Amino acid sequence: MNTLQTKNVALVAGASGIVGRQLVNTLLQNDWEVIGLSRNPSPHLQNLPVVTVDLRDAGQAARALQPLTHVTHIFYSAWLNAANWAEMVEPNVTMLRNLVSSIDTVASLKTVSLMQGYKVYGAHLGPFKTPARESDPGVAGAEFNAAQLTWLSDYQLGRLWRWNAVRPGVVGSNVPGNTMNLALSIALYASLCQSLNLPLRFPGSPQTWGSIVDFTDAGLLADATLWAATSPAASNQAFNVNNGDVWRWAELWPLIARWFEIECAPPVRVSFERMFKDYRSVWRELALSKRLAESDILKLNDGQFADFVFRWDYDMFGDGSKLRRAGFRGMQATDEMFFRLFRQFRAARIIP
């Protein structure tokens, strides 16, 4: 345990995800030493020191993490899926516990940052109080984000390091190959509609069309996460992190259609997952004719998270003012975020 260490050393769990990859880039740009953590080798982490470990196994975690005596900050954005919300609790709390307790034993920790989301407010269950605030009471029912924070805050008592939790809205990212990338799902859908001479029909219900939603740019989220990890004002606090604006799909969707130069059409329920499977051969032909980087649309995005989002027929937004009052000043116009991501997808030959 090096108590004289001055350089910040980040251990990032979930480094290959849409949140983790941007966070790694931001940390490196700010002269941090970064170590990735992964259950399986990832091609996205080739230029990063990586510890491969299954955090569900306490013994394996302790052995694999024992050499990391120089780690100062843990950034935790990993998660394990399961058949239902209740079954997600035990493995996800176990993974966090095995990581934090192992590093706490060997290193002089400063901060543990936990990535959460609006599920702590019951957003996944149905209509909930909006804007959601960090001071809102908990929600009955098993949910791993809340269970993780309960464990972390209890474990930290009496220790010198501090924790923080960040709670983004729907994250906007340029990372392909991840189901959680809504912007890419929309871009693929729009590209298919364009190639089939179809209008860009809103894929949700009329209620979803009129609902309010907020978003979080991955770069802004990384900046806020770094700020929270290094600011005394964030000690043992949770923060909603959003772009600072809210939108109705009825306002945003026509702007997206205009960007793709497609006619906008009224809501009809469309499953992105079903469409991407049904039009897999259409995408393959489009990719070949336009010389796109990936000819298999399902390797880019499976549409499942998009279907989840477009089933929200209720408002989904949080109050981001606590973060700004504490000292973080970042903002992002959501429409411009989407347009920038679409340009990046096009530049990378992901969409035509």
Language-model region placement:
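N-terminal Rossmann NAD(P)H-binding glycine-rich loop of SDR-like oxidoreductase domains
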Residues: 2-30
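Conserved Rossmann-fold NAD(P)-dependent oxidoreductase catalytic core, especially the SDR/UDP-sugar
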Residues: 74-76, 94-144, 164
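NAD(P)H-binding glycine-rich loop region in Rossmannoid oxidoreductase-like domains
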Residues: 42-98
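A conserved pocket-lining segment of Rossmann-fold NAD(P)-dependent short-chain dehydrogenase/reductase
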Residues: 188-216
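Glycine/proline-rich active-site loop of Rossmann-fold NAD(P)-dependent oxidoreductases
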Residues: 159, 171-189, 219, 227-239, ...
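Active-site Tyr-X1-5-Lys
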Residues: 138-169, 174
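Mid/C-terminal beta-alpha module of Rossmann-like enzyme folds, strongest
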Residues: 222-307, 319-321, 325, 342-349
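Glycine-rich Rossmann NAD(P)(H)-binding loop
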Residues: 13, 173, 204-211, 239-246, ...
